[in-house]
């Protein structure tokens, strides 16, 4: 085992291709241990603080179960039940919380919040989701693709839907891991250039036609049309995105062995047809489970280094 200095995971670009190669293989090993009921407690007596400003099912469950399976335990905090919701400065909260725990996961709104927190933390901080990025989910998605089809390098991932935190994280992943990213969204919901790194220009292709975006894709993926915090726009978004539902016709334009993914929760009949998400090309349940395994690998790496 090798040690590593304090490292945060705030966006996908925070790690190198070499680190991702290690993490993805480590997730495979930890998943095998989980399936074989092997005890592995490298984080014995370590504490994870989970801070939630946004509600969650999969994020809380996967992190809480994951730290337990690694021998540690979790403490849940939300803004309703802590001083974070009563105006305590983020910098002060980071100083205090990071003196009492070993690692911190935050699910919040603006990326600036988690960046400020990490800047004053004495322990690793993990992005459990922000408005801008969702790195743990895309890490799970990449792992799922590799598990099902092998290397993602040189492949094409098609994103059909909103320019949200998942889309921006996929762009970073394409740059880091060497695949092409097709993006298609209706007018008015295009990518923010400020969140698209110049280094990813060679991997990104933008399409007006979602069918065209799916052509040649090895993976087609999407997300809800209305993310948390944008509920007031829901009806307008439904009208704008009605031609951006992932359909069997879109999957037929992709590669014959293409997969479908969705980070969940899904709305059948909106961003995806039931026939697609419940069909043979969908791997959404493996994708959801794999949050557990990649996050275990991530926490182990941030606290213990490489094994």
Swiss-Prot record:
Enzyme Commission code: 2.1.3.3
Keywords: Amino-acid biosynthesis, Arginine biosynthesis, Cytoplasm, Transferase
Pfam families: OTCace (PF00185), OTCace_N (PF02729)
Binding site for L-ornithine: 165, 223, 227-228
Residues that, per the record, bind carbamoyl phosphate: 56-59, 83, 107, 134-137, 263-264, 291
Entry-linked Gene3D superfamilies: Aspartate/ornithine carbamoyltransferase
Catalytic activity annotation: carbamoyl phosphate + L-ornithine = L-citrulline + phosphate + H(+)
Pathway in which this enzyme or protein is active: Amino-acid biosynthesis; L-arginine biosynthesis; L-arginine from L-ornithine and carbamoyl phosphate: step 1/3
GO molecular function annotation: amino acid binding; ornithine carbamoyltransferase activity
GO cellular component: cytoplasm
Principal location class: cytoplasm
Subcellular location: Cytoplasm
GO biological process: arginine biosynthetic process via ornithine; citrulline biosynthetic process; L-arginine biosynthetic process
Top-level class of the enzyme under EC nomenclature: transferase
Transferase is among the record's keywords: yes
Domain of life, per lineage: Bacteria
NCBIfam families for this protein: orni_carb_tr (TIGR00658), PRK00779.1 (NF001986)
PANTHER family assigned to the protein according to its UniProt record, in alphabetical order: ORNITHINE CARBAMOYLTRANSFERASE, MITOCHONDRIAL, ORNITHINE TRANSCARBAMYLASE, MITOCHONDRIAL
Biological role: Reversibly catalyzes the transfer of the carbamoyl group from carbamoyl phosphate (CP) to the N(epsilon) atom of ornithine (ORN) to produce L-citrulline.
Family membership: Belongs to the aspartate/ornithine carbamoyltransferase superfamily. OTCase family.
Name recorded for this polypeptide: Ornithine carbamoyltransferase
The species this protein was found in: Cupriavidus pinatubonensis (strain JMP 134 / LMG 1197) (Cupriavidus necator (strain JMP 134))
Organism placement in taxonomy: Bacteria, Pseudomonadati, Pseudomonadota, Betaproteobacteria, Burkholderiales
Gene: argF
